[in-house]
Amino acid sequence: MKLLFKQRLFSWFDSYDIYDENENTVYVVKGQFAWGHCLKIFDASGWEVGTVKQKVLTLLPKFEICEGDRCIGYISKDLSLFKPKYNIDFNGWHVKGDFLEWDYTITDAYGRSVASVSKEIFHLTDTYMLDIQDPADALYVLMFVLAIDAEKCSRN
């Protein structure tokens, strides 16, 4: 399954659509004013399906990933000197790659690819693609990608 989003994606108090490869809206993301970043994810029918919330009283950036009312995992930035590194606390997932260039991979505990994230260059505006192996993981992958970008945006 592939999910696509356009350049204007990460605007904190705006809403934007996440598309499938046929440009059908799959999710809608809405930024919410809160202490720290907070994004609510809705399915195409308008039902809230997930939330990405920044934990504010932490030394390094950390985000809570929730499905409905239940916290299912965390992603945090690790201390590193040159390249950003992140730690995912969910199903044994790991993330590695070049986060600054939007080219990274999420793998499971056995090293198998869960998803890859890349920047598409053949579009009029910057378009980002999530290539997700199992459609059942689409919401989870999207929420972790949103958290990584939230951390990147807060540095700029």
Segment roles from a protein language model:
Residues 1-156:
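Intrinsically disordered, low-complexity proline/glycine-rich segments
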